[in-house]
Amino acid sequence: MFRLSALLGGLGLAASVLACPSGQQQVCAVVCFCAPISQADIEVLYEDVSQMAASGLEQWLLQSRETAAASGTLPIPLHIRAQLEPYYDIGVLDAARYKVGDGETLGAANTMLQNPDVQAVTLIDIIVFRNAADAQDNVALWAHELLHVQQYQQWGVREFTRRYTRDHDAIEAPAYKLQIEVARALRAQVAQSGPAR
């Protein structure tokens, strides 16, 4: 089943839910209807729309990154970096920068990145946090966002956006998995150290 509806806010091509006559496929663009189009044509259309969505996301990321960089960024806080060194190559940790509170960038991220509860957004190598507390204390969130920095490094911006528009869950799942792993490790570390005195 294609995920086109996730790409362009409701424009989609889905597997047949309603029976279409022979030689027709269900096409959904605001409403669903049967059209005399082959599965091969649907795949070509899907690829074209997917490429347009990826290109738009790529341009937004590049422009947003430049805007964020121009207004100033900071390196990863040392206490955060020290806790994440076991999880990341030095190249990821050295490349990543951050800033706090750019509401306009985060607002666009809510729309562009299909995630209504964004706490941070990674603009290639710049992580924009919604609030300063997360930037200074949320090691698990840092782990999540740094995985995206690593993905950008491995794939490049164009390939990242292509993959993201095709299946954003496949991009986010490993980041959420690592976020949970780091949170558990931190809780275990606190439990082993005992109560504060």
Located regions from the model:
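N-terminal signal peptide c-region/cleavage motif recognized by signal peptidases
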Residues: 14-16
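A metal-dependent hydrolase signature that marks the N-terminal structural subdomain at the beginning
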Residues: 20-101
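Second-shell loop/turn segments in exported
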Residues: 65-73, 128, 132, 161-166
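Auxiliary, metal-adjacent structural segments of Zn-dependent hydrolase domains
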Residues: 71-121, 126, 181, 185-187
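Post-HExxH zinc-binding segment in Zn-dependent metallohydrolases
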Residues: 91, 154, 164-197
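Short pre-active-site segment immediately N-terminal to the catalytic Zn-binding motif
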Residues: 112-114, 122-143, 165-167
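Catalytic Zn2+-binding segment of zinc metalloproteases
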Residues: 132, 146-163
